[in-house]
Regions:
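Short, surface-exposed recognition loops or helix-turn segments adjacent to catalytic cores
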Residues: 7-17, 35-38, 113-117
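Class II aminoacyl-tRNA synthetase-like tRNA-binding/catalytic domains
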Residues: 1, 7-11, 19-23, 28-33
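Beta-rich nucleic-acid/ligand-interaction surfaces
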Residues: 12-24, 118-126
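Short Asp/Glu-rich motifs
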Residues: 19, 41, 170
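Acidic, His- and aromatic-enriched active-site or binding-groove loops in soluble protein domains
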Residues: 26-49, 56, 108, 134
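Positively charged, Gly/Ser-enriched RNA/tRNA-binding surfaces
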Residues: 1-6, 49-212
Length: 212
């Protein structure tokens, strides 16, 4: 909103929901990686083919196929409970439910949708993951999530949340949506004779102190 966009959606998922389902299915790491890539790309036939080749129970296979279709309103959260009894996955669902409550209290729920099949190729995500979308771009304009153990690699044990804004895509969206962004900038150019160099430097420092 601060950038000027009026119509946008932030899509929420949880990294541990997929991990819980994979854990419940007893998948090896290689299969989990392959399946993650297929789900990320919403490749229904690829998921079907991969799981069929692993001789998994039909119920398990159908559960992962349903995962590809579980995106949209907050009602997807309740449906997700029917897919699993895994504690890790259910804890992820409970977290999403709590976040939905908070978003409603803050009056932000209309900007939010859910994708239970949202996965990330980045293994350091440990909780909520999200992507933001708007009209006029072919991809997300912001992406991020929670990573509780990433900072351990840099010597600090601390939970964290981070995100990245795709500035070029935001600007493209603003242009295509014909949104004018207020822009105020005062520029100053100081011309001086060599004899006035010191005074010009002082004046330049003064202007920079005023963020000009």
């Amino acid at each position: 909103k601060a950038a000027g966009l009026r119509e946008f959606q932030v899509e929420l998922g949880h990294a541990d929901f997929y991990r819980g389902l994979a854990e419940e299915a007893g998948m090896d790491e290689e299969t989990q990686e392959q399946l993650r890539d297929l789900i990320e790309n919403k490749n229904y036939f690829g998921v079907d083919e991969l799981l069929s080749s692993r001789n998994l129970p039909e119920e398990t296979k159908q559960g992962f196929l349903k995962l590809l279709e579980m995106f949209g309103s907050a009602g997807q959260i309740a449906q997700a409970k029917e897919l699993t009894a895994n504690p890790r996955a259910l804890k992820a669902i409970a977290r999403l439910e709590r976040i939905q409550e908070l978003l409603e209290d803050y009056g932000l729920a209309d900007y939010i949708s859910y994708d239970l099949g949202m996965v990330s190729r980045y293994q350091y995500y440990t909780g909520i993951i999200f992507k933001g979308y708007t009209y006029g771009t072919g991809d997300y304009i912001v992406t991020g999530g929670r990573y509780d153990r990433l900072l351990e690699q840099f010597g600090k044990n601390s939970p964290a949340v981070g995100f990245a804004i795709e500035v070029d895509r935001v600007l493209t969206a603003l242009l295509r949506q014909r949104i004018d962004v207020p822009f105020t900038q005062v520029s100053a150019l100081i011309l001086f004779d060599p004899a006035a160099e010191k005074q010009a430097i002082r004046l330049g420092r003064h202007f920079r102190g005023l963020s000009l």
